[in-house]
Design a protein with these regions (language model features):
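Hydrophobic beta-strand anchors of alpha/beta hydrolase catalytic cores
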Residues: 64-65, 96, 154
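Conserved segment of the thioredoxin-like fold in thiol-based oxidoreductases
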Residues: 87-134
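A short beta-strand-turn-helix
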Residues: 37-63
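Conserved redox-active cysteine motifs that mediate thiol-disulfide chemistry
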Residues: 67-84
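Sec-exported extracytoplasmic/periplasmic mature domains
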Residues: 58, 77, 84-91, 113-117, ...
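N-terminal targeting signals for export/organelle localization
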Residues: 1-45, 195-198, 202-206
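Thiol/disulfide oxidoreductase modules built on the thioredoxin-like
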Residues: 115-117, 127-188
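Second-shell loop/turn segments in exported
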Residues: 67-71, 97-98, 174-175
Length: 206
């Protein structure tokens, strides 16, 4: 029995810490965190003009802002999932906005190819040297993201609950410090974009 126990311990010690890490993923749970998220105006990839966040989210029920580096393998894992969720819920008031980091705008365009991105993309930084200077880095520190580059990093905003004026949009928000867990986030989005009010009930008439 002691030999069997020793064999089990050695096997566990030599195994990868998680199957996610072994598969090259950095999945993270959806959690509510204090983030002190601020509004921004950043240059759009398609328009080459400043795009204001408040304008981009008008009329939406839920918005996922995803910060990413186009060269990052974990972002490339998440990108098809983000596009899939956007396609599924966009007609129900869901919006995705991508914020590119640590790569040139030309590199971002090359990543998305001739078809271009399926949702709006804006640029916050264009050099890896900017890593510790970006708002993205600051938000990651507040939410406990200890990864090196923090790509992807996802934050969910509910426009109806955001501050109507001022730079600060919200103190708290739901975030994912890594790749989305598709089933979990799918359910979350579905619950947020579902009708919040039931139709009026007509009383019975005799």
């Amino acid at each position: 029995m002691n030999k069997l126990l020793l064999l089990i311990i050695l096997t566990l010690a030599l195994s990868p810490p998680t199957t996610w890490a072994q598969a090259g993923h950095e999945y993270s749970a959806l959690v509510e965190k204090t983030v002190n998220y601020k509004s921004w105006s950043l240059v759009g990839l398609k328009t080459d003009k400043p795009e204001d966040l408040r304008s981009l989210i008008v009329g939406k029920k839920l918005v996922m802002v995803v910060y990413f580096a186009p060269w990052c393998g974990n972002w490339r894992n998440e990108a098809p999932i983000a596009a899939k969720l956007y396609e599924k819920y966009k007609d129900q008031g869901f919006q995705v906005i991508g914020v590119s980091e640590y790569a040139s705008r030309d590199d971002v365009r090359k990543y998305f190819g001739e078809a271009g991105p399926p949702y709006p993309i804006v640029t916050e930084s264009e050099s890896r040297d900017d890593k510790q200077k970006t708002p993205h880095y600051g938000y990651r520190q507040l939410t406990g993201d200890s990864r090196n580059w923090g790509s992807p990093w996802n934050i969910f905003l509910e426009p109806s609950k955001l501050n109507a004026t001022g730079d600060l949009l919200t103190e708290k928000a739901w975030v994912v410090n890594g790749e989305l867990i598709e089933d979990e986030v799918d359910k979350f989005i579905g619950s947020k974009v579902a009708a919040t009010t039931a139709g009026a009930i007509e009383p019975c008439k005799n």
